[in-house]
UniProtKB/Swiss-Prot annotation:
Organism of derivation: Rhizobium johnstonii (strain DSM 114642 / LMG 32736 / 3841) (Rhizobium leguminosarum bv. viciae)
Signal peptide: none
Homology family: Belongs to the XseA family.
Organismal lineage: Bacteria, Pseudomonadati, Pseudomonadota, Alphaproteobacteria, Hyphomicrobiales
Keyword terms: Cytoplasm, Exonuclease, Hydrolase, Nuclease
Reaction catalysis annotation: Exonucleolytic cleavage in either 5'- to 3'- or 3'- to 5'-direction to yield nucleoside 5'-phosphates
Coiled coil: none
Name of the molecule in the record: Exodeoxyribonuclease 7 large subunit
Location of the region described as Disordered in the Swiss-Prot/TrEMBL record: 497-526
Annotated Pfam families: Exonuc_VII_L, tRNA_anti_2
Cystine pairs: none
Main location: cytoplasm
Any one GO cellular component localisation term in the record: exodeoxyribonuclease VII complex
């Protein structure tokens, strides 16, 4: 300090160094403004610094003052500062001697009245609404009966207990709780991350993806609920692919997440009631529907029973149903017997007509051929009878299928008819087989007669057949002349011989022609 008694000094003012003056100002300001309340608009806010401190300014229409909130104080704020928000800051004013600047160190911060916050909410609401985040077309329907419910709320307090208790009472399901802070610094980010985290789960993963989400918080002041007005929370709710129920505060409390959610519940308990139905009511409804269904089925059964009775009255009796098939079967069986008998008679007559003109060896071959043909026809006749019987049985089976739904009385008549038809089938089969056996017996007898008429059987009894040089049988001595070569056929072979004299022909007998005779024409057995 200079000498105050120096005669050259124009005044008696004390002289300060820059440091002394800055320190004196600092002490004066901090003493005079140790605790002040300042109203102003937040300006230049960019969120907390990496150190955790927040730096911004408070301004009005004529002045501006720098402000700082230390990390410890910032974490205790009830709401998050935002650019343009009008607030009331409480703290002390201090200066920095090194730069000749002053600032307010904020100890508490509160909105400058509810009107300021509401104005900010309205401005944000208009902005997000213009982007379509609140459109009704984005809303999703809640599932009727979710299997898993995700809850985003504080893990402590009455809210989560009320939700779990209400869900357990109404319809117990699996509940996943994502614990978050519901107010204070960082609460908005935690709520948004929880919503996105639930949406990122795989439906078939180890932790199942919820079918519906509940974002809940208890009641509080506008500042307490401010996190749910945060833009990041609103966007996360609007982007959620899982239907979301907002249950923030009481019924009169509205936040921006309520507009972005698919459904707003007045309270957390109301959200639980919206998420699941009442199991007892569902059981009662199911019982009522079952009773109505049973009544409907009973009415349908009565109607069907009456229809069956009407059909039974209109349906002809079993005898009427089987009359035509039975008559056709009888006609076929009778016609078959008569046809076989007539055919056998005709064949016998034809055989008798041509038997005299047939040579035994050729006749035996023809008989074998005809026997084979007859056997084939008999086999075809048997197959035809079997097919006729099968068709009759098929008709009876179809009649049985129609009659199967009729009362027991009609079924008894069907059984009796089936038994009669079986007897008729067996009688017809027996009759046909008897006719075939008799025809075979007659044919065998005729074959034996034919064999007995063969000249070879006569030769076996000591007779012989004499044939001329042309191998023709000689039945009279007059047909031979002296010196003619002949063949004598015995039962075991032939021998040649020569006549020594000719026979004397009887009176009126024509001389035998020496012209070779034509072989006799073979007659046909059929």
């Amino acid at each position: 300090m200079s000498n105050v008694f120096d005669g050259d000094s124009p005044t008696n003012l004390a002289e300060y160094s820059v440091s002394e003056l800055s320190g004196s100002i600092k002490r004066t300001v901090e003493t005079a403004f140790d605790q002040v309340r300042v109203r102003g608009e937040i300006s230049g806010y960019r969120g907390p610094h990496s150190s955790g401190h927040a730096y911004f300014a408070l301004k009005d229409d004529r002045a501006r003052i720098d402000a700082v909130i230390w990390k410890g104080t910032f974490s205790r704020l009830k709401f998050r500062p935002e650019e343009g928000m009008e607030v009331i800051a409480t703290g002390k004013v201090t200066t920095f001697p090194g730069s000749s600047k002053y600032q307010i160190v904020i100890e508490t911060l509160e909105p400058a009245g509810a009107g300021a916050l509401m104005a900010l909410i309205e401005e944000r609401k208009r902005k997000l609404g213009a982007e379509g985040l609140f459109d009704a077309a984005r809303k999703k329907r809640l599932p009727f009966m979710p299997g898993v419910i995700g809850v985003v709320t504080s893990p402590t307090g009455a809210v989560i207990r009320d939700i779990l208790h209400r869900i357990s009472d109404r319809f117990p399901v699996h509940v996943l709780v994502w614990p978050v802070k519901v107010q204070g610094e960082g609460s908005g980010e935690e709520v948004a991350n929880a919503i996105r985290g639930f949406n990122a789960l795989e439906p078939s993963g180890t932790i199942p993806r919820p079918d519906v989400l509940i974002v809940a918080r208890g009641g509080g002041s506008l500042e307490d609920l401010w996190s749910f007005n945060d833009e990041i929370v609103v966007r996360a709710a609007a982007e959620s692919a899982i239907p979301l129920i907002s249950a923030v505060g009481h019924e009169t409390d509205w936040t921006l997440i309520d507009y972005a959610a698919d459904v707003r519940a007045p309270t957390p308990t109301g959200a639980a009631e919206m998420a699941v139905p009442v199991k007892a009511e569902l059981e009662a409804q199911a019982a009522g529907l079952a009773a109505r269904l049973q009544g409907c089925m009973n009415r349908q059964m009565d109607q069907r029973r009456q229809s069956v009775r009407a059909l039974m009255r209109a349906l002809p009796s079993l005898d009427q149903l089987l009359a035509l098939p039975r008559r056709r079967f009888d006609e076929a069986a009778t016609g078959l017997g008569r046809g076989l008998e007539l055919n056998t008679i005709n064949k016998r007559r034809g055989f008798e007509r041509v038997a005299a003109h047939l040579r035994p060896d050729l006749l035996a071959g023809r008989i074998a051929e005809r026997r084979q043909t007859l056997n084939e026809r008999m086999a075809r006749a048997e197959r035809m009878v079997e097919r006729l019987i099968d068709r009759s049985k098929s008709r009876v089976d179809r009649a049985e299928a129609i009659l199967a739904s009729l009362p027991a009385r009609l079924k008894t008549q069907t059984d009796r008819g089936r038994e009669r038809l079986g007897n008729l089938s067996r009688h017809a089969d027996t009759a046909v087989r008897h006719q075939l056996t008799r025809a075979r017996s007659e044919l065998s007898a005729q074959d034996r007669v034919l064999q007995s008429l063969s000249y070879k059987n006569v030769l076996k009894r000591g007779y012989a057949v004499i044939r001329d040089e042309d191998n023709r049988p000689v039945s009279q001595a007059a047909h031979l002349s002296a010196g003619m070569g002949i063949a004598i056929e015995f039962a075991d072979g032939r021998v040649g011989a020569m006549t020594t004299e000719g026979g004397t022909p009887p009176a009126g007998a024509k001389k035998r022609s020496t012209k070779p005779a034509e072989p006799p024409k073979q007659g046909s057995l059929f």
